[in-house]
Amino acid sequence: MIITPPSTTTESWESESDDPEKGYGHDNEEEYGFFERGRGRSRRGRGHDDDDDDDDDDEDDEEQSPHTIKRKPNPQKEEFIYTLQEEKAVVRKFDRKVVVFMAVLYMLAFLDRSNIGNARIANMDSDLQSDPPNPQLYSYALSSFYLAYLLFEWMAILWRLIPAHVYVAVLVASWGVVACLQGVATSYPVLIGLRFLLGIGEAGFTGVPFYLSFFFRRGELALRTAVFISAAPLATSFSSTLAFAITSLSNVIPIAPWRLLFLIEGLPCILIAGIAWQIIPDSPQTAQFLTARQKKIARVRLQSEHQQAAPSSSGSGLSALKDPVAWTTSVIIMLTNLAYSSLPAFLPTILTAMGHSSLSSQALSAPPYLLSFLIVLVTAYLSDLYRSRGPFLICHALCSCAGYLVLAFSERMGLEPGSWLRYAAVFPAAVGFFNVVVLTIAWNVNNQKGGGKEKGVGFALMQVVGQLGPLVATRLYPDGDGPFFTSGMGVCAAAMGGVVVLAAGLVRYMDGVNKRWEREEKEREGEEGVQLMEGERGDKGGEGGFRYML
């Protein structure tokens, strides 16, 4: 597939009119319609101001600049005019106030989830092990988290039912308390129970990409999702660095390093929960950092895509369960989770089995995730720029598959356990699956037809099916398979190869559907004297202007 860059004409506009921070306009809650006029420099849609004196009509009598965007509900009502600069100012505020804060929260969540791998090689296993030893207890501790994660994935739909500032604050505080309690566990059964509770607390947070769709357009979502998800490799890198620092001080601190690790990484969540209650907006209209006019701009700018989406029907929520796109992206996430969930938990152990010391393994765990963090941001930016997900996803899945193949066949290739080539292969493996997760989540949300119901159900489906992967992933690297862990690496390689096949098939399917919708619309436009009433549009996705993002 050849990807051509989108036109950058609209992005180069510079406004000469109103200050984007100027707070005029009203908070009317009426919904806006939308329509497109040609492919010129200005977009026109439907919006309105209810008060006659709003904006003083100072721009209505002037010839309109190509730097302005008009929206109006019908010819009898005033046009709501705002500039591209004003729209960008609103988006920048969402980026700073919403996306960055959510990324910080996710970093803390992933930190509390994955630090068990570092704690294990910091003598946690020997302190908690039963008598006689049971080598499966560590895997049980990992599995209990993902079992709870799977059973409580339905909580992702609560983003529509509970105010976000309340929901997030409660979740963050709950998993922070449980994360700290891991540091005082006296046995593996206690730790297993705490990991289950941690999984419940973090399961509800999986709806953040869906929450971000309340604020951003489809074409803007991948980069924002990437900023959010990229906190995962950053958290793992930070956790490894912190574990290295704590472990290196093990001779001068009175508490076991692994206990201190849990306490230090859990406490910030408790502290930040109160901040979350105060600053997280439930929607653009409740964002305290927006002026009244900016709230109106935030509402109106999203109406273009809401109007282009396929109309919702009474069974629209359940219709998402029949959508092949939702199911395919769900299976892609499930396969990717085999690698995504296992490597952060087992990499320190794998590096130790390669012959590195415990201290060196903590340090060597960080670089692959730091590189993943940087490349995730670059990939997401390009994905949004070209409005394309599939080709980038396929490329990264291939890279991850290649890395795992090297690790899987390293013993047959005659490589030493501590070979530099084995360590180098970890980099494309990690970079690849982190990018696949980001792109697949954005792909799922982008391609759910209809309104919030369909998107909510489709996203919840992806989360539930996706969490079947980690239940298997926690058993991929038993100690007896070291130092090469051939079977686990082979499973991950096969999983990422399956992602390539599924993603390629999905791109082809959606491309065919898009072309069919275009043909049908051209045929309807060519029929003279036939007018479709609004109620006749049904749920045919393409008729509302909706197209799958490939």
Task: Locate each region found by the language model.
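Structural signature of the two symmetry-related core transmembrane helices
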Residues: 166-180, 391-406
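Extracellular/periplasmic helix-loop-helix junction of adjacent transmembrane segments
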Residues: 117-151
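Extracytoplasmic gate region of multi-pass secondary transporters
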Residues: 117, 317-381, 441, 474
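Cytosolic juxtamembrane N-terminal segment immediately preceding the first transmembrane helix
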Residues: 1-52, 56-119, 126
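Helix-breaking motifs and short loop linkers at transmembrane-helix boundaries and internal kinks
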Residues: 128-129, 152, 163-164, 184-189, ...
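Central mid-sequence intracellular linker of multi-pass
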Residues: 218-232, 252-322, 487, 492-528
